[in-house]
Amino acid sequence: MSNSSARPESLGEYLAHLPLSDEQRAELASCTSFSELHQRLAGNATATTTEAVQASVGPRLTVGSAAELEDAEMLGVDGSGRLCLKIAPPIKRTRVVPEPWRTNVLIRMWRRMTGRTNAPQPPKRELPPARWRTVGSIRRYILLTLMIGQTLVAGWYMKGILPYQGWSFVDLDEVVNQPLWDTVVQVWPYALQTSILILFGILFCWVSAGFWTALMGFLELLTGRDKYRISGSSAGSEPIAPEARTALVMPICNEDVPRVFAGLRATFESVAASGNLDRFDFFVLSDTNDTDIAVAEQQAWLDVCRETKGFGRIFYRRRRRRVKRKSGNLDDFCRRWGGEYKYMVVLDADSVMSGECLSSLVRLMEANPDAGIIQTAPKASGMDTLYARMQQFATRVYGPLFTAGLHFWQLGESHYWGHNAIIRMKPFIEHCALAPLPGKGAFAGAILSHDFVEAALMRRAGWGVWIAYDLPGSYEELPPNLLDELKRDRRWCHGNLMNFRLFLVKGMHPVHRAVFLTGVMSYLSAPLWFFFLVLSTALLATNTLMEPQYFIEPYQLYPLWPQWHPEKAVALFSTTIVLLFLPKLLSIILIWAKGAVEFGGRIKVTLSMLMEMLFSMLLAPVRMIFHTRFVLAAFLGWAATWNSPQRDDDSTPWSEAVRRHGPQTLLGIAWAALVAWLNPSFLWWLAPIVGSLVLSIPVSVISSRTRLGLAAKDEKLFLIPEEYATPQELLATDQYTHENRWHALHDGFVRAVVDPRQNALACAMATARHGQAAPIEAMRAERLAKAIEVGPKGLDLGTRLALLSDPVALARLHAQVWAEHNAAWIDVWRASINNDPHSPLLPLHPANEAQPSLVGA
């Protein structure tokens, strides 16, 4: 390592970024080299340059704040005597072994016949008999009867509406013997109609399920007499036992750091205000592989611990080996620290929860020893774009009906949505670790949508899964615009299709098999609807272009006329409209009955509902096309990536909207032209579909504008209770987000290399703490040489991650950059500071403030 003399201006610049008093700075300014500077900071004049720069990490980190870190007992040393921050508790490993999946029924039978079985797993318990289990089974049989009966009646009406009614006249012997073209002409219309009828039945049954779910949810919320609600099993004020320790875990990956730690701080402070902080620990579990964001996370963790005095309560861990995505992140936590906690609450990066809500969840778990998971119903809030505010309004107004309805049908065999829920640790560790799906292709490998699977495994192991749909204090955020929502939907679509491979896995409860099926239908309904419309258009073309076949069998005495029953068409259309829109109307009726002030009043909430209904009708065909593409992409094995540009105001640029929605617009125009050519009168029926596709570009762009969203808020449109009377947790989150953005750390990796204090923090939080070994030293030397040669702009991601994880290499790179005054690194660092007027420059202590001496020689 170079030990050249330090330029006075470089040394002064270096010292200016350490929070020193004037006396300390003047004392250290007499150093003739950076090697001497690090020796004096470390208090060891005889140390080599390599040893000194590593030893100076502690003084550089603690100068001005040593007492704070020492009082919290945050400073420690690793096995090689290097300083480190205690950013996580001591590891106490627990065995976490996923059970291999046997998804093929035939292979499973063969293995059983040949005497081969899986490795023994922890014994599963039987869920104790309870009245709710019998009631739930009866309710689900009733639901199935209602859905099938309603679908059969609608199918009968649909069959009567279709024009061709001659299947009974088709003679199969005649079909086989006649020319192929005659067979096609004769059978084609009836084959089309049969396909349309089958698709209609599937889609109508899906709509029927949603209708009955919303209707029962409406009755539950209106009467308030749900004796099976899980939240009624606790008094709500009993003290939490000391052994009921709970870990709040927040898995993150390349997230918006200011918002993440603002929500974490608001949640932490709310728990502290509840008086139960000693029962909770907080873990930020990072899978971030962007080094700039990773360094920003480190600084944000230190800041939030200082601001809340959360040292020893708020922990941070960034994985170096990112396996199995989010489920692997949780597995890693369970393996390292899960045995120390009785419960775990999983938070999303945008989650906020009140201390009372979290305390209530723990009390409910204590009161229900057979519950494995209790899921809250998060309220969407905090967004300002027009699109997000309409979605917030929809989920806040209609969502409670569907959530309460799900609880009515499922009771203790319900959903888990992956966040804002409490989990019993022991059965989760023993039974809910997820093995990769076997095989090759798009539907093999790590499970993407882990939440439904974990709920199914928890129930299979004999534990209940409940929705506490009426528990307040649980919040989340929604995507700000349509394209961001669709980007998320693509991942969810692939995950739900993968999960269906588990439909026949041994031991799954029928309810959770149905959950896998509904998860698939959430996205498969889109291509089914699309093909239904395509086949309907094909039937129109057939009816228009092909000569009707009035006589389709030999010696037929009377012609078979195409039929039209307008009364059946009107009845079926009216019924479908009722099923689709009555839940929205029931939601408004419920709000009128309970009080509409928090939603802007009766008139405004009704007007908002009508506007949201129109907007959802505009977007439904757009989502249909995208979801159809997502399903096809999953089956064809196309990569599920979607790179959108960074947007400061969350708005969609016109260029991106044209690129994403352009093909849909062309499809809508071509489809409308075809139908107009075939039968102009039919265009009125198809206008809502093709019109939405044609308008998709401006609708996507305009709805993403924050200005329109705020204007609607000023007019009390799409108002939600969290905006009318904002909870303290959301107010705090908004305040801390603004503060964090003002002081956000940019170009984090460059600062971790160059900045004296940031480098010390990164070295103290680095986790690759290897001993001395020749291969490791050779690898370090190679990485250092590469970093010096190519500079920050040319350094690849793998090398960046390796350097950030290695405290020795990072300290050496820091020393070498300053010793050689490497312009490639220092100039980028200076530019980063100059371009960021709110950069968190370290404060310089006043000259009259006493500081401990840093000079050791």
From Swiss-Prot:
Its main location: membrane. Its EC number is 2.4.1.-. InterPro entries: Glucans_biosynth_gluTrFase_H, Glyco_trans_2-like, Glycosyltr_2/OpgH_subfam, Nucleotide-diphossugar_trans. It is a multi-pass membrane protein. Keywords: Cell inner membrane, Cell membrane, Glycosyltransferase, Membrane, Transferase, Transmembrane, Transmembrane helix. GO terms for cellular component: plasma membrane. It is found in: Cell inner membrane. Pfam families: Glycos_transf_2 (PF00535). The chain crosses the membrane at residues 142-162, 196-216, 515-535, 572-592, 606-626, 682-702. Pathway: Glycan metabolism; osmoregulated periplasmic glucan (OPG) biosynthesis. One of its GO terms (molecular function) is hexosyltransferase activity. One of its GO terms (biological process) is glucan biosynthetic process. Belongs to the glycosyltransferase 2 family. OpgH subfamily. Involved in the biosynthesis of osmoregulated periplasmic glucans (OPGs). This is Glucans biosynthesis glucosyltransferase H. It comes from Pseudomonas putida (strain W619).
